[in-house]
Amino acid sequence: MKTWIFICMSIAMLLWFLSTLRRKPSQKKGCIDAIIPAYNEGPCLAQSLDNLLRNPYFCRVICVNDGSTDNTEAVMAEVKRKWGDRFVAVTQKNTGKGGALMNGLNYATCDQVFLSDADTYVPPDQDGMGYMLAEIERGADAVGGIPSTALKGAGLLPHIRATVKLPMIVMKRTLQQLLGGAPFIISGACGMFRTDVLRKFGFSDRTKVEDLDLTWTLVANGYRIRQANRCIVYPQECNSPREEWRRWRRWIVGYAVCMRLHKRLLFSRFGIFSIFPMLLVVLYGVGIYLTTWFNEFITTGPHGVVLAMFPLIWVGVVCVIGAFSAWFHRCWLLVPLAPLSVVYVLLAYAIWIIYGLIAFFTGREPQRDKPTRYSALVEASTAYSQPSVTGTEKLSEA
């Protein structure tokens, strides 16, 4: 039943997306300041900053060295020598990501600021920023883009996640905007804000998911949040199961803590259609999986449990989604890997059971994780518009 509901939702979202293709990006160049926090980002920082500085939509790029202990400061100095006044290098004692972003905001002079991460590839020769800026010009106070996956140099786990990540984010956040009035989150990897709005509310380090906390704060105060599905960026993913576990634990526990902090939102339109469905899907999924697995184990044994994890219609659906992702990333290996995306479903369910529900009542979060960075980013001169690998390229070069 849930698979058919998902198929109907997907068709509806596709039709809605096709209806928006006539919208044009803003052509107002040089009117956005980019702010990038950096803590021990030496391996990937230079290429990320170079791509941002080559983007004609940005007036200046502000990078805040948040007390790094590697060569981040030296990399920033080299970028400064190359780009001069268009690059603003700021160094401070470690305060956390929220504090670094707010310090960078002190140097912003444009009416709009774009926030991203040091490991994220932002295409310099596409109109993604233009589509976000167009939403601002239509009255939005903050706009979220789509964080996809950087596959160059990535291992097996990022490829598995990339099989469904982009289409699922587009579908979920579009549906949240239509029904709940705003997307669930403006990702820290791709968000644009009116500068005066961000200065008024700002980021807080009271949670480890400052982007989610800020999004919900803006919604609670009546600000207009929008989604720009044609602005796509490419952050690095975790290559090891341990780092992936820690990152998902931070996200899910942070989600639970934000529900605790924003109780007044829970039964609003946004809460009912954008916040609660994420949790209800988990609770429903856990119940269905446990019931199905138990029945299969009793009737057919362990192999029945394995077959229940990969029902034929579900495999077909995720392979279709994987085929789109494979075309988009120019990596056809994503099609056969698509059924393995169930690993991330089970990962999320397990973390919710172990940590998420407890965090809602205690408000306690783990320390912020720091995934291992790798230097294989796409450079501005790359022929393709997004990071890609071929089917014969090694999954990991890191």
Curated annotation (Swiss-Prot):
Keywords: Glycosyltransferase, Ligase, Transferase
Its EC number(s): 2.4.-.-
Annotated transmembrane regions: none
Alphabetical GO biological process terms: DNA damage response
Similarity comment: Belongs to the glycosyltransferase 2 family.
Organism: Escherichia coli (strain K12)
GO molecular function terms attached to this record: glycosyltransferase activity; ligase activity
CDD domains (UniProt xref): CESA_like
SUPFAM superfamilies reported in the protein's UniProt record: Nucleotide-diphospho-sugar transferases
Gene, per the UniProt record: yaiP
Name of this chain's protein: Uncharacterized glycosyltransferase YaiP
PANTHER family in the cross-refs: POLY-BETA-1,6-N-ACETYL-D-GLUCOSAMINE SYNTHASE
